[in-house]
Curated annotation (Swiss-Prot):
Belongs to the glycosyl hydrolase 53 family. It comes from the Eukaryota. GO terms for molecular function: arabinogalactan endo-1,4-beta-galactosidase activity; glucosidase activity. Transmembrane segments: none annotated. GO terms for cellular component: extracellular region. This is Arabinogalactan endo-beta-1,4-galactanase A. Residues 1-16 form the signal peptide. Keywords: Carbohydrate metabolism, Cell wall biogenesis/degradation, Glycoprotein, Glycosidase, Hydrolase, Polysaccharide degradation, Secreted, Signal. GO terms for biological process: cell wall organization; pectin catabolic process. It is an enzyme of class 3 (hydrolase). Induction: Specifically expressed on arabinose and galacturonic acid. Its main location: secreted.
């Protein structure tokens, strides 16, 4: 049995202990087109990527949609964003949704024009897609650090063929997508990630990986990283101690590095739909609370063997401050002034 460590007993971290101190700023170009100009802590207008890198962020996550109706988050959109990210000196992590729209546990719609009836055809389409994405980035002299084959795929991917009613299909798809990345012309092969939701729920993580690897169609050598989402405002059981147990078990059972790839903490949450986890209940809903939460989360991740990093999800999406939650504001930007909050400095110490 693996016993969760007492959080209070975790050692203090040295500066910049995590490999990836990241943020997902996928909506940046859309926000700028809407007229938003971000301001640094001195109140001066500055490009968001420069504000972030100056405060310790070293990696940016970007969601990629296949063929969205309005071009949002498509390949061209992400090339524009990635060029700015790379120029600012940060690494790039592509979160491939493998859909024309949002992909998450409730919806994994196959892109228009991809097969929904033949798994062999679909695996080749996925292989060619991940190959093309990586090669297009290479042609534009953009290096990719991480590629996630799907987004929050605990319920499968590329439905209906990739539903959890057929884990062998899921395994074939993950294998095919991974090899498109491996066969690409990227100067250094990007790290390949599988990303599930509810990172605090070890039973959910264990069932998925045990089942998909048991098919034999996905090999442990096909991927490098296990990514998880960890949101404290959707379930009172999502404690830091539960997360630590889950990440520890994931790493020790599968010998993979682990990353928390989505997380948030609110500056305003007057009417939460769910109770917050017990070991987080003392943290205030404020910029100071964001710092405290991320510091505690970093302690958990750093305390796990091969715990590599944290990515804060959409800290500057001013037009969507709730970020899909019941909390009013989870941003690191003041929604009235577009100036970043003091909490942005926490990345320097993670």
């Amino acid at each position: 049995m693996i016993y969760p460590l007492l959080l209070s007993a975790l050692p203090l971290l040295s500066s910049a202990a995590l490999t990836y101190r990241g943020a997902d700023i996928s909506s940046l170009l859309i926000e700028e087109d809407a007229g938003i100009s971000y301001k640094n802590l001195n109140g001066e207008t500055q490009a968001l990527e420069d504000i972030l890198v100056n405060n310790g962020v070293n990696s940016i996550r970007q969601r990629v949609w296949v063929d969205p109706s309005d071009g949002s988050y498509d390949l061209d959109y992400n090339l524009k964003l990635a060029k700015r990210v790379q120029a600012a000196g940060m690494s790039i992590y592509l979160d491939l949704h493998l859909s024309d729209t949002w992909a998450d546990p409730s919806d994994q719609t196959t892109p228009t024009g991809w097969s929904t009836t033949d798994i062999d055809t679909l695996t080749w389409q996925l292989y060619n897609y991940t190959l093309d994405v990586c090669n297009t980035f290479a042609e534009n002299d953009i290096d990719i650090e991480i590629v996630s084959i799907g987004n929050e795929i605990s319920s499968g991917l590329l439905w209906p063929l990739g539903k959890t009613s057929n884990y062998d299909n899921i395994a074939k798809l993950l294998h095919s997508g991974a090899w498109g990345v491996k066969d690409s012309n990227q100067a250094t092969t990007p790290k390949i990630m599988i990303h599930l939701d509810n990172g605090w729920d070890w039973e959910e993580q264990e069932y998925f990986y045990k089942t998909v690897l048991a098919t034999g169609s996905l090999l442990s050598t096909d991927f490098d990283l296990m990514g998880v989402s960890y949101y404290p405002f959707y379930n009172s059981e999502a404690t830091l101690s539960a997360l630590q147990t889950s990440l520890t078990n994931m790493q020790s059972n599968y010998d993979k590095s682990v990353v928390v790839v989505e997380t948030n903490w609110p500056v305003s949450c007057p009417d939460p739909e769910y109770s917050f986890p017990s070991d987080l209940s003392s943290i205030p809903f404020s910029a100071a609370g964001q710092e405290e939460f991320l510091e505690k989360l970093a302690e958990v991740v750093e305390g796990v063997t091969d715990g590599l990093g944290i990515y804060y999800w959409e800290p500057a999406w001013v037009d969507n401050a709730a970020l899909g939650s019941s909390c009013a504001d989870n941003l690191m930007v003041d929604i009235d002034t577009d100036e970043v909050l003091e909490s942005v400095t926490v990345f320097e110490d993670l």
